[in-house]
């Protein structure tokens, strides 16, 4: 059996990832549909473990990454977890980013083709996940979107590195600055994905080019419209079969060679990103951005600009901790209290 015997997928006992192997194909599914398949800290560890196992298993030739259900492929990190945990302990966000790096690098370093099966929206780190994959098949009702600058973060876990070499500089900037949804047809036209497959039906009829209204009705199950992923599954299975019709060592080295520019951009920047984000999580931007997202309200972007323009601090909520509190005498208090009066 050698030093790396094949293990049954079920033996790992994952809680937030569904792992399966069949006919030389490993399927890794983010199993958090109630959270739009946002990955938690635990999910990142399970994803990296699954990819490492699939990489080492000679009974696996192709890997498929997807999400549960039809609403989301992956929506990046769990913003509720961010808001509750990481904005209060930014040092732990550095550790979290180490887990995220391990997950993304486990995709890059599998030595085997990885197919992203976009069963729904790919947002934030979800887009970074599909960018890390080798090929992407996208359901027509899905969309791609970045959110970083609108939630107090920066999409430097793959998007800032790989979008310029995937869609070009100007389009990358459009995606990253504006954070607007990119529908499937545009994603295909821009080269973000390889194939788009119809996924909207009305009764027995497939809608070959569903418009935005038809997609909304299908997602809500209105007027006879519904989402059907059967053609997506057939396309992914057909692609996996094509990929298996090649020599494994040649496929592995082809991936290594083609990864050159992705590896270069990634390794030159991601450790800086990890450290900067950990430091940034001590500031007011992620606190406001993440809480606004969780509370489903607009973030107060203009407040920071107004403070900075008035000569105040835009980095901390109540000003830098440089004053002695007039009420209690405590040192290193913020410049202002929540009511805006000097401390």
Which positions does each model-derived feature cover?
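Acidic-histidine catalytic/liganding microenvironments
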Residues: 22, 57, 76, 110-111, ...
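Hydrophobic/aromatic residues within transmembrane alpha-helices
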Residues: 28, 65, 78, 129-131, ...
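C-terminal long alpha-helix characteristic of the crotonase
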Residues: 33, 137-142, 193-271, 279, ...
